[in-house]
């Protein structure tokens, strides 16, 4: 490739030099011009070939890099597949499916749960005020029940006055909606008048009575009027439900399965009764011990008193014997306040 390019460049240089010399000598040659064009075309062809060679070389380098990258990925994949195959072979195989139910609940339990929660999926009749909540009746639900009742029985303009009248709640007859009272026409002066005498004329028209319930009385008639509906139980209902009771048992460390509240209550009552009996027994034993200790103290006090009396009796006998032997001496008088009072009384009497 390099030799070919060098030859093309030399040929172009030689042809170009010859062409310049011929032009300088003012003797241009057509043959030299054709050779110059041929050398230029050959040089262009060689340059295009060089460009193709360089592109192919770059493509080869890129393919080598991609090949090495893919080889690395293939090695990793093969290593992963080999490890997975080894792990799969290490797993023990079973011929039969594992025993036991497939799910933790049965179909009957699922249906029973759906039946219990079905009452919370739709609002109560009092919340909707008897209005159909389907999409087709949504526009009609925007009116009050009393308005819908009144509109349902509203007569049309095609009805006759004899059979299309409304009775208000006060018993008066009102003119149908859309109809007016007949008025005598005066198109013909010769036509006889159809005016009735005053005694046979109908009573004057009165305004229809308002049959709508006042707003402040609607909550009294319907406690669920304008009540908020939630298709799920509230937090208070959940806290007072069975699930909350089971959670409290779990928090207390009690297994809910097989737990019998009646048995636990009976056991608690029995334990309370046993505790009270033990306390009563301990109290009786304590009182008995106190009684025995008190009796023992009283017995010891009586024994000490008897010993003291015996000792005092022996001392009195010895004193009497000594007094009989000794010379009789007058006993000293014992000073008392009563004696002094008697002497003062005697002195007062002498005076």
Swiss-Prot record:
It is found in: Nucleus. Keywords: Activator, Coiled coil, Nucleus, Transcription, Transcription regulation. GO terms for molecular function: transcription coregulator activity. It comes from the Eukaryota. Residues 257-308 have a biased composition (Basic and acidic residues). Residues 156-217, 256-351 are annotated as: Disordered. GO terms for biological process: regulation of transcription by RNA polymerase II. Pfam families: Med4. Residues 163-177 have a biased composition (Polar residues). Residues 30-68, 262-311 form a coiled coil. One of its GO terms (cellular component) is mediator complex. Residues 182-198 have a biased composition (Low complexity). Residues 340-351 have a biased composition (Acidic residues). Component of the Mediator complex. Component of the Mediator complex, a coactivator involved in the regulated transcription of nearly all RNA polymerase II-dependent genes. Mediator functions as a bridge to convey information from gene-specific regulatory proteins to the basal RNA polymerase II transcription machinery. Mediator is recruited to promoters by direct interactions with regulatory proteins and serves as a scaffold for the assembly of a functional preinitiation complex with RNA polymerase II and the general transcription factors. Belongs to the Mediator complex subunit 4 family. This is Mediator of RNA polymerase II transcription subunit 4. It comes from Chaetomium globosum (strain ATCC 6205 / CBS 148.51 / DSM 1962 / NBRC 6347 / NRRL 1970) (Soil fungus).
């Amino acid at each position: 490739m390099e030799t070919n390019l060098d030859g093309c460049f030399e040929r172009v240089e030689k042809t170009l030099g010859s062409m310049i010399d011929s032009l300088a000598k003012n003797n241009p040659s057509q043959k030299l011009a054709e050779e110059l064009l041929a050398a230029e075309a050959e040089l262009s062809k060689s340059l295009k070939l060089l460009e193709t060679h360089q592109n192919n070389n770059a493509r080869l380098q890129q393919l080598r890099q991609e090949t090495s990258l893919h080889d690395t990925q293939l090695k990793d994949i093969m290593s992963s597949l080999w490890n997975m195959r080894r792990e799969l072979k290490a797993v023990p195989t079973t011929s039969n499916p594992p025993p036991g139910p497939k799910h933790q609940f049965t179909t009957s339990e699922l249906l029973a749960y759906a039946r219990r929660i079905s009452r919370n999926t739709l609002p109560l009749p009092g919340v909707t005020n008897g209005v159909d909540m389907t999409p087709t009746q949504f526009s009609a639900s925007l009116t009050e029940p009393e308005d819908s009742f009144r509109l349902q029985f509203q007569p049309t303009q095609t009805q006759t006055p004899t059979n299309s009248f409304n009775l208000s709640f006060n018993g008066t007859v009102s003119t149908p909606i859309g109809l007016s009272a007949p008025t005598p026409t005066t198109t013909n002066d010769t036509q006889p008048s159809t005016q009735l005498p005053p005694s046979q004329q109908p009573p004057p028209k009165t305004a229809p009575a308002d049959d709508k319930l006042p707003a402040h009385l609607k909550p009294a008639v319907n406690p669920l009027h304008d009540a908020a509906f939630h298709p799920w139980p509230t937090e208070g209902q959940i806290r007072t439900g069975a699930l909350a009771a089971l959670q409290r048992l779990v928090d207390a460390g009690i297994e809910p399965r097989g737990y019998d509240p009646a048995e636990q209550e009976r056991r608690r009552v029995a334990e309370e009764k046993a505790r009270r009996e033990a306390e009563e027994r301990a109290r009786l034993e304590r009182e008995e011990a106190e009684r025995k200790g008190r009796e023992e103290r009283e017995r010891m006090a009586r024994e000490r008193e008897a010993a003291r009396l015996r000792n005092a009796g022996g001392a009195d006998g010895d004193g009497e014997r000594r007094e009989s032997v000794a010379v009789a001496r007058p006993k000293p008088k014992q000073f008392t306040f009563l004696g002094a009072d008697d002497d003062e009384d005697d002195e007062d009497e002498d005076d």
